């Protein structure tokens, strides 16, 4: 994906070296945008192999409103283990905010259900937004949300999604985020009777950790390959009814995986 490789190249060329919360050190730029037209293929990185199983199960976990790693671990996914407490809980992170945003009167807002309803019945609304950045709840999250909020846009029978990501680990995290939100867009388009349009990924602090520089250079040396296609079970009409078996990535021919250590 040229958009992603251009981002890597920009950060290597223009990035400023900065300290960070983890003590690892980064080079970063502030403000970057990538656009992916899903008509051109599913944006799953080809210059290194991604673990699609983790991406799908994590998204289903978010949509369940779950915040305990047991569901992920039961399906062989370990990407959240480092931030979980001794009971496996992560606090009021993504799934909680997406499905159970607390209100002042003691109630809860299911933002995903409201987004589906708005897309179907008020598609011209400029308020079709789902936010995980709940300022009053940040102290109850083991890790504040990096991909903070996203907005839907309906035009000419197509549904598009724009994500704002405040903190973007470009080598490890961003490829997962691209694939995850592109998949969410396809799922939301299907259940609302629309075609999937563009996924727009807007980044705030876009950084490469200093211990990932050699991996990034290796990735930039590889020639991108044609994008795969994501096939989704057409019989699923409710956003909360999707199962892992409803997804099939076809014609995915990536370069080999490149390992990198997660900064915790």
Curated annotation (Swiss-Prot):
Its EC number is 2.1.1.45. CDD domains: TS_Pyrimidine_HMase. One of its GO terms (biological process) is dTMP biosynthetic process. Pathway: Pyrimidine metabolism; dTTP biosynthesis. The active site is at 146 (nucleophile). Keywords: Cytoplasm, Methyltransferase, Nucleotide biosynthesis, Transferase. It comes from the Bacteria. Homodimer. This is Thymidylate synthase. It comes from Bacteroides fragilis (strain ATCC 25285 / DSM 2151 / CCUG 4856 / JCM 11019 / LMG 10263 / NCTC 9343 / Onslow / VPI 2553 / EN-2). The lineage of its organism: Bacteria, Pseudomonadati, Bacteroidota, Bacteroidia, Bacteroidales. The gene is thyA.
